[in-house]
Amino acid sequence: MSKRLDKVKLVKGRQWERQDPIDNIGVSTYVLIKDAIQEGRNDLAKDLADYVYFWETKFARDTNFDLIAGWPEFVRINYGEYAEIEDQRAAMIQTRMWKLPFTEKPTVQKREQSPYDYTMGYGWRMLKYHRMGKNDGAGGFTIEEYPDRYEFVWDPCYSGGRPRRGDPVTGTPPRTSPLYTGNQVPHPWSWGKTGVPGYCMHCALIHNIMDVEQRGYLQWASGYPDDPWKPCTYIAYKDVDWIPEEYYTRIGRTKPKVTSTAPRPKDVNKLIRVIHSDELGPEWVPTLTMLKKAIDAGKKKEALKIVDQMRDEMGRISMLIWNWSWMELIIEKYGYNELYHALRSIPCSYALPPAPEEPRPTKADIPNAEERARRGALWGRSDRSGPNADCSVNIIDEPDRVVMELAPCGSGGRGLMTIDTPGMERGPVTGNPWNFKTTPVAHPVAWNKVGVPNYCARCCVHMEMGSLSRYGYLTTVIERPENATDPNCRWFFYRDVDDIPEKYYTRIGAKKPARQK
């Protein structure tokens, strides 16, 4: 019998939480799912699978998506819409590492793949890794076939559409107002529309404009709806020469000369069929669904493999590189002070600022050290911390505080390491080809230390300064190693926040509050 499994306390309320004893909260939920499968505790295994998919992974994941969405909005509000798209382009080039050059007059070059096959390849990654479609991707998506095209229907797009609608799983409202209000003037990179959030603009830029700049053709047309409750679509034409001129005009480009001899069908709006992604083959079935079916069928070996597959899929999205690229851009162009203001303008689920009408919390409102450690452990597990990204943390219960060790941290720390996961192989992101940097001078945004990886400033501002802003106290203290290449951080949760040494306030430019009785 698994002692760690017996300690699991899964609370299923409006939000699902693991309220395990303090000595168990660092254990990977994926390990616990495996324990439950091996012991035949199938209901618990499926409950833990739902929890890790819908709640645990979303904690850091959605915050990282919101962070990506926040950078262009910050630049637009403070430096204008042309600066926003200039920085978007630079971030896309660094994130994607294109091999082909961009040019105003590219050599017109059709892909060897059909538009449908090309979009299908991308769509599979969007479903599995990006969680596009209904119910956070667990409900799949549909493809509508018309005589001249296929429309991939994302209802919603997880990264852009979810923030526009709000999140039905977590119950959070739309992010659009007042945070992500979008452009005020129509541009080619907003499909000629206004009010397009900065995150959504990257689809116009990367999937439309930049593709035309490389090959002369659109890979697909992006269907961005004005109404957030209507789905986004990838419109893949059966022949790229059939793509209407309007899709080029709206992005400020000219349609290439038609070379196809195939006549475009006339009744193009006649729906031929609707295909659900589950019908495309077993590889298209959401992994959560596959896992539950294997558990119900008693196929333990298969289920155990699917658990590893699900954990692996949660890490196959480039949010670390994307966010780090944006941070490097802001530091280089605008400086560390502006990085601070950018981070403070983007809410973080770990330490949300008080709502305007909410009374300022007091020391008495601060959760106890164990509860804060549970939240920290949730972040660490969600952020894929631990050896081999196993989504675990180490918890040490000390007399005056609870210590959480990230060995390594799943984001900034893992970025400093060589990764050999098949399909994701890379060296440290501080080396080629990214060459991300560390702080050259001491600054409060990075604990007044030199040599801190720039990405780590995110934890300093969101976790430490965020809690200070909310409570007037540091409720989480983070100790970043002095060695810039060391990926292992420690978080401290003091039992009495008055016992936090003053140096932890001083290093972020704050003053320690007077001790309260």
Task: Show which residues each predicted segment covers.
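N-terminal accessory segment detector
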Residues: 1-488, 492-517
